[in-house]
Curated annotation (Swiss-Prot):
Name of the encoding gene: iscS
Source species: Shewanella baltica (strain OS155 / ATCC BAA-1091)
Described function: Master enzyme that delivers sulfur to a number of partners involved in Fe-S cluster assembly, tRNA modification or cofactor biosynthesis. Catalyzes the removal of elemental sulfur atoms from cysteine to produce alanine. Functions as a sulfur delivery protein for Fe-S cluster synthesis onto IscU, an Fe-S scaffold assembly protein, as well as other S acceptor proteins.
Protein family membership: Belongs to the class-V pyridoxal-phosphate-dependent aminotransferase family. NifS/IscS subfamily.
GO biological process, one term: [2Fe-2S] cluster assembly
Gene Ontology MF terms: 2 iron, 2 sulfur cluster binding; cysteine desulfurase activity; metal ion binding; pyridoxal phosphate binding
GO cellular component: L-cysteine desulfurase complex
Catalytic residues of the enzyme: C328 (cysteine persulfide intermediate)
Pathway linked to the protein: Cofactor biosynthesis; iron-sulfur cluster biosynthesis
Catalytic activity: (sulfur carrier)-H + L-cysteine = (sulfur carrier)-SH + L-alanine
Sites where the protein binds [2Fe-2S] cluster: C328
Keyword Plastid: no
Cofactors required: pyridoxal 5'-phosphate
Keyword terms: 2Fe-2S, Cytoplasm, Iron, Iron-sulfur, Metal-binding, Pyridoxal phosphate, Transferase
Protein name: Cysteine desulfurase IscS
């Protein structure tokens, strides 16, 4: 067993060896290295064909038409292109956007930028289980609302939104629906023929593909228009200029094909490992699961260990590669804004750890993780005066702390 044990699949995934092998075939002189836009020779034609195959593989993952797939550098760019692209194209129709407080920073900061440009954004509060209630979404809708951006699966707590219901509501009001599927594509079934979603952001490195590549699904019927954010040679039907990185795209395509073929078996195995982990640690006193216990993606487990400081717990769990929030914001010592939005106090938010399990996690690793977590919590609580006070029946919320 290799230490530390990788339990941070929501931050990134290793490239599947089958994907890496396909990618390498598109990089060197004796491979398919050409520019897909080179129309005058075989090197270009071969690269174009490889890109077309990958585009179809990604389309098949979500049951879309291959012409609805636009390649980007990742989900952050896809989110920017979707949200800014819609806002700038449809601004004469309205300047109101709805999103939620628990979105990824790539959505929240894009919306903040649009606010500086004169757009109005409503940030919805989730319920205590992390899911946005439909009535809150409907109440926020106005005549000048042009876009709703709600994530499919949350990156910190793993809860799944009812995208069918959100899509129906948005379509009935004539509002465009964008969904950040960075954490769900390849893990949760998505069918754009059945779900009324207009724009979907997809990330390569969250589904065992390479970093630096993603896609944006843009619906053709009814047609969604976007204003380009990246200008140049007019690639991707003018929506996203830049030479297509054949090896990255082939990697994303292969990752999508594997995910589609193995989704059900992966989901069952990963879900069983997650349940094993939770069943192994839930007996620890003052341990709480964050987010809805049922409506969640199989690989995600966000747990608060009360009266233990999150950063010291991270240090104690040096055998486990885990996080105390999203990787994109873990450099800040602020408690997770997602957990704060669920109503957790600073102490509970600070004592939370995100465990995310994936394709290469083993039973042996989970057994070791349970042992390490149990021992670390016991050790840290022995040293904690707060734990001692709690065990003595003192209500810590009522304590008047002296200010120094």
């Amino acid at each position: 067993m290799k230490l530390p044990i990788y339990l941070d699949y929501a931050a990134t995934t290793p490239v599947d060896p089958r994907v890496a092998e396909k990618m390498f075939q598109c990089m060197t002189m004796d491979g398919i290295f050409g520019n897909p836009a080179s129309r005058s020779h075989r090197y270009g034609w071969q690269a174009e064909e490889a890109v077309d195959i990958a585009r179809n593989q990604i389309a098949e993952l979500i049951n879309a038409d291959h012409r609805e797939i636009v390649f980007t550098s990742g989900a952050t760019e896809s989110n920017n292109l979707a949200i800014k692209g819609v806002a700038h194209f449809y601004h004469k129709k309205g300047k109101h956007i709805i999103t939620s407080k628990t979105e990824h920073k790539a959505v929240l900061d894009t919306c903040r930028q649009l606010e500086r440009e004169g757009f109005e954004v409503t940030y919805l509060e989730p319920a205590a289980n992390g899911i946005i209630p439909m009535e809150r979404l409907e109440t926020a809708m106005r005549d000048d609302t042009i876009l709703v951006s709600i994530m499919h699966v949350n990156n910190e707590i793993g809860v799944i939104h009812d995208i069918d219901a959100i899509g129906e509501l948005c379509r009935s009001k004539g509002i465009i629906f964008h969904m950040d599927a960075a954490q769900s594509a390849g893990k949760v079934p998505i069918d754009v023929q059945a779900t009324k979603v207009d724009l979907i952001s997809i990330s390569g490195h969250k589904m065992y593909g390479p970093k630096g590549i993603g896609a944006l699904y843009v619906r053709r019927k009814p047609r969604i228009r976007l204003e380009a954010q990246m200008h140049g040679g007019g690639h991707e039907r003018g929506m996203r200029s830049g030479t297509l990185p054949t090896h990255q795209i082939v990697g994303l395509g292969e990752a999508a094909a594997i995910a589609k073929a193995e989704m059900a078996s992966d989901d069952a195995r990963i879900g069983a490992l997650r349940d094993k982990l939770w069943n192994g640690i839930k007996h620890i006193e003052e341990t709480y699961i964050n987010g809805d216990a049922i409506e969640r993606v199989s690989g995600s487990l966000n747990v608060s260990f009360n009266y233990v400081e999150g950063e010291s717990l991270m240090m104690a769990l040096k055998d486990l590669a885990v996080s105390s929030g999203s990787a994109c914001t873990s450099a800040s010592l602020e408690p997770s804004y997602v957990l704060r939005a669920l109503g957790l106090n600073d102490e509970m938010a600070h004592s939370s750890i995100r465990f995310s399990i994936g394709r290469f996690t083993t039973e042996e690793e989970i057994d070791h993780a349970i042992e390490v977590i149990t021992q670390s919590i016991d050790k840290l609580r022995e040293m904690s005066p707060l734990w001692e006070m709690f065990k003595d029946g003192i209500d810590l919320n009522q304590v008047q702390w002296a200010h120094h």
